[in-house]
């Protein structure tokens, strides 16, 4: 079984499932076993809020444990056998791909095989046979080659939880020299917006409320708080567009593909005066994970 996983700072995504990348350890059984991973005698509640930012994802076991939870969730969704062999298809930003590739592969492909654990009180026995790594963002375009057709140059803007990753593709090939990673992800926007709402209204709105308003979804909230969130959403998009320009890219001259969790926010808050050349939005947060799987399937088919 091929399982594609996008290890985001904000959320863990597979082809079919997404949950927050938070994790809390318990020495004793929690009050509910929902989303609970039991591994080596400890209990881990997966998907609870957001964990402390760790730029090196291999510095602790959190992302490994979240990987096991993601495998279990994907098996559950596919109604597959819980004793199975898995090939993991994962990604890294192209800007750090060469530097981090080997370490991240070894982090996920451990000597302890098969990996045995309980998830939501059900037993899993997983043989991780291999870990394939691909550039994130670019891999999602494996699902949408039409966005590159007849375009000599395209700018890919992946707005993630902590970073905005930029990459220009020339004749559908990534130009490694153009890769940039800006620390302007959605987490920054949400944190700064929450603080601005507190200052202006005295209200302490939640991350989930802010997200819903930024995406234009319904949410019961004081109108003055809603206005602050919407205004901050526009300011956030202006910061991203300005930072992209300062990084040497002309959004008015080159077609752009926006993806990641923040692409939906950008689509809602971008205006005609921004003059973006042929913007395309991949709003599916599962696109990277699905793209990783597609590439491995294509490799097998050859």
Task: List PLM regions with ranges.
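Nucleotide/phosphate-binding catalytic cleft detector across ATP-hydrolyzing
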Residues: 1-154, 173-188, 200, 207-302
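Ser/Thr-glycine-rich phosphate-binding loops at phosphate-binding pockets of nucleotides
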Residues: 159-165
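PRPP/pyrophosphate-binding module of the type I phosphoribosyltransferase fold
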Residues: 166-171
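A contiguous pocket-lining binding segment that forms or flanks enzyme active sites
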Residues: 196
């Amino acid at each position: 079984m091929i399982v594609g996983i996008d290890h985001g700072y904000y959320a863990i995504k597979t082809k079919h499932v997404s949950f927050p990348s938070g994790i809390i350890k318990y020495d004793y059984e929690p009050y509910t076993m929902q989303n609970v991973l039991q591994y080596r005698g400890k209990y881990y509640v997966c998907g609870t809020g957001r964990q402390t930012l760790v730029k090196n994802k291999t510095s602790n076991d959190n992302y490994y444990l979240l990987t096991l939870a993601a495998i279990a969730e994907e098996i559950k969704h596919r109604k597959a056998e819980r004793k199975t062999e898995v090939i993991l298809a994962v990604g890294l930003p192209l800007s750090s791909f060469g530097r981090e590739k080997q370490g991240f592969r070894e982090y996920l492909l451990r000597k302890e095989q098969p990996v045995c654990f309980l998830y939501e009180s059900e037993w899993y026995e997983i043989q991780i046979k291999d870990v394939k790594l691909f550039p994130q963002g670019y891999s999602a375009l494996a699902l949408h080659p039409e966005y590159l057709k007849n375009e000599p140059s395209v700018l890919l803007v992946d707005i993630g939880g902590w970073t905005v990753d930029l990459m220009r593709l020339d004749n559908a090939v990534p130009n490694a020299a153009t890769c940039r990673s800006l620390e302007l992800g959605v987490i920054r926007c949400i944190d700064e917006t929450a603080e601005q709402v507190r200052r202006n209204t005295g209200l302490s709105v939640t991350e989930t409320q802010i997200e819903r308003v930024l995406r234009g979804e319904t949410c019961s909230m004081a109108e003055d708080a809603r206005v602050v969130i919407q205004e901050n959403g526009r300011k956030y998009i202006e910061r991203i567009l300005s930072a992209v320009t300062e990084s040497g890219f002309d959004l008015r001259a080159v077609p752009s593909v926006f993806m990641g969790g923040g692409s939906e926010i950008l689509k809602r808050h971008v205006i005609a005066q921004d003059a973006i050349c042929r913007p395309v939005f991949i709003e599916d947060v599962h696109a990277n994970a699905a793209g990783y799987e597609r590439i491995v399937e294509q490799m097998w088919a050859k």
